[in-house]
Amino acid sequence: MTHATPQELQAETREIIENLLNDGSDPNALYIIEHHIAHYDFDKLEKIAVDAFKAGYEVSDAEELEDDNGKPLYCFDIVAEVELKAEIIDAQQQQLVPLVAKHGGIYDGWGTYFEDPNADEDEYGEDGEFFDDEFADDDEKR
């Protein structure tokens, strides 16, 4: 997805949203949007993460993978919780794609999760925090 035009990104966004809503995902929910980022240089990937964080986004931990040729590739997600509206995601991409390109990274599109309109509670907890410290409860019990 590195060389996608803004029009291609917008078309893909609308297709993803349409598919989610057609499958019954909750149109009124807040969605965790994960913009997928990759780079062959870990130090440059970190610079992208720092810039994204400074721009107000959350970032996931980096992972090391291998590309199709067995070469190490580093990846992480730039994350925001927003309404599932194309205009919001378009604006995020307009901000993030140049930021990623500035450091020679790869923008590999975005994804989210199905939101069940009949769910009793938010799977991320009452505070809506996606990146809660999973060990916080363990520390409090000690």
Curated annotation (Swiss-Prot):
Question: What's in the keyword line of the UniProt record?
Answer: Cytoplasm
The protein's predominant localisation is cytoplasm
In its UniProt record, a GO molecular function of this protein is: endoribonuclease inhibitor activity
Q: Which Pfam families match?
A: RraB
Location of the region described as Disordered in the Swiss-Prot/TrEMBL record: 117-142
Function, as annotated, reads: Globally modulates RNA abundance by binding to RNase E (Rne) and regulating its endonucleolytic activity. Can modulate Rne action in a substrate-dependent manner by altering the composition of the degradosome.
The UniProt similarity line reads:
Belongs to the RraB family.
Q: What's the name of the protein?
A: Regulator of ribonuclease activity B
